[in-house]
Structures are given as structure tokens and as C-alpha cells.
């Protein structure tokens, strides 16, 4: 048995996903979100056993969204405004508390195991949920506050190729090889499918 634990986490990026009138998506370029301290993943699944002839006969399963929870350094005010679905005044460099109108995004990050193997995880479409900001006075201790946000993923319409076929999928992940990071998760780069081909791009 080769015992492993998760140890290492970095490079949280996000890219805007635009949904057209026909429901088809296009992806923008990767942008830096914040320094990443912790990431948790919880699939929203449910199941129920159905009984026939006085015994449990079948199990019905259902799958909902997948929820990611991130603890990060404090993003820029503009980034916080964007993901919260508020309005950014670029002239005044000011966040406006307008009515919330959240956009879809893709997110990606790199995590590692204790042997140094790194993996990239690309979540293709979702919306940022609740964010948590807590402010505190400066005192004579090392007290500080981080930033917390959730991301609820859904399955995009685009079919992503794999194993000679294709399927709709919410995310993909794999161990990084030489040169992979520059292709799959690079600031200013395209959001790509499993093969490394760019997904439909926003003009």
C-alpha cells in the first residue's frame, strides 16, 4: 500500500462563461482570482432505496450541483465585485451595491499529493455563491482574516471529447505532465477541453 495524503494547493484562476440566446456557451480567458489556502469539494447527491415484495429492491440515485468551497487571500475589489454579481465603476474604481446579477464562470486550480505529484482540476461552468468577508481591528497579535467563497458547478451544454468519444461533463482533472500547466491553466490563456483544444471562445 502506497499511503498518500493531499498536501499542496495553488493557482486559483477563473474565466467568464457567456451563455447565448440559444443556450450555447463561450469562454473568456483565464484570470487570477486570489491566493489559495484551502479548497473543499462536496458533490450534491441523494439516493433512496425502493422496496418491493418486502425487501429493498432498487436504489434510485440523483445528482445535483457540485459545491466547491475556497479559502483564499483577499481578491482585488474589482474581482470581489465581479464574482458577487455587482457593478464595477471603472472610472472611480468603485464597487457599487447594485442589484445582484451573477454571471457564469469556469474555475481551475492545482492541488498536490505528499509525493509531489500535482493535479489540475478544471470546473467548466458554475456560479459563485456566498462570499464571506470579516474585518477586524489591528492589534498586537497576528490575528488576520481570509476570504471565503463557494462555487456551485453545473454541466455545460458543450460535449467534451474523451477516449475517442465525447460527453457532457462538469469538470475534469488529471496529473500534470511537462508543459501541461501552460496549456490547461495559464493566466491569459484559453479554457480548454481534456485534449487541450480551446473551448468555444468569447469574441
Name each model feature, range by range.
Residues 1-40, 198, 202-203:
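Polar/acidic, low-complexity leader/linker segments enriched in S/T/G and N/D
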Residues 43-53:
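N-terminal "mature-chain" segments and other terminal, solvent-exposed stretches
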Residues 54-60, 93-97, 133-140:
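Catalytic micro-motifs at enzyme active sites that drive phosphoryl/nucleotidyl and oxygen chemistry
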Residues 56-81, 143-156:
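Oligomerization/assembly interface segments of phage tail-like spikes and tubes
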Residues 74-79, 86, 104-119, 156-159:
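Long amphipathic alpha-helical segments
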Residues 76-98:
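Charged, amphipathic alpha-helical segments
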Residues 96-131, 136:
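Short helix-loop boundary/capping segments
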Residues 126-203:
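Mixed-charge, glycine-accented linear interaction segment located at domain edges/termini
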Amino acid at each position: 500500500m502506497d499511503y498518500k495524503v493531499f498536501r499542496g494547493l495553488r493557482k486559483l484562476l477563473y474565466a467568464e462563461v457567456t451563455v447565448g440566446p440559444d443556450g450555447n456557451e463561450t469562454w473568456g480567458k483565464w484570470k487570477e482570482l486570489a491566493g489559495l489556502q484551502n479548497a473543499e469539494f462536496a458533490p450534491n447527491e441523494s439516493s433512496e432505496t425502493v422496496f418491493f415484495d418486502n425487501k429493498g429492491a432498487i436504489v434510485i440515485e440523483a445528482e445535483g450541483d457540485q459545491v466547491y468551497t475556497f479559502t483564499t487571500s483577499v481578491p482585488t475589489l474589482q474581482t470581489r465585485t465581479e464574482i458577487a454579481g455587482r457593478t464595477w465603476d471603472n472610472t472611480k474604481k468603485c464597487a457599487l451595491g447594485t442589484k445582484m446579477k451573477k454571471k457564469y464562470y469556469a474555475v481551475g486550480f492545482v492541488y498536490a499529493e505528499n509525493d509531489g505529484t500535482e493535479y489540475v482540476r478544471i470546473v467548466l461552468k458554475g456560479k459563485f455563491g456566498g462570499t464571506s468577508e470579516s474585518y477586524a481591528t489591528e492589534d498586537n497579535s497576528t490575528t488576520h482574516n481570509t476570504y471565503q467563497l463557494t462555487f456551485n458547478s453545473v454541466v455545460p451544454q458543450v460535449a467534451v471529447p474523451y477516449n475517442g468519444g465525447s460527453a457532457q461533463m462538469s469538470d475534469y482533472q488529471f496529473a500534470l505532465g511537462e508543459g501541461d500547466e501552460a496549456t490547461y491553466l495559464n493566466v491569459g490563456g484559453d479554457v480548454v477541453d481534456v485534449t487541450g483544444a480551446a473551448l468555444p471562445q468569447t469574441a
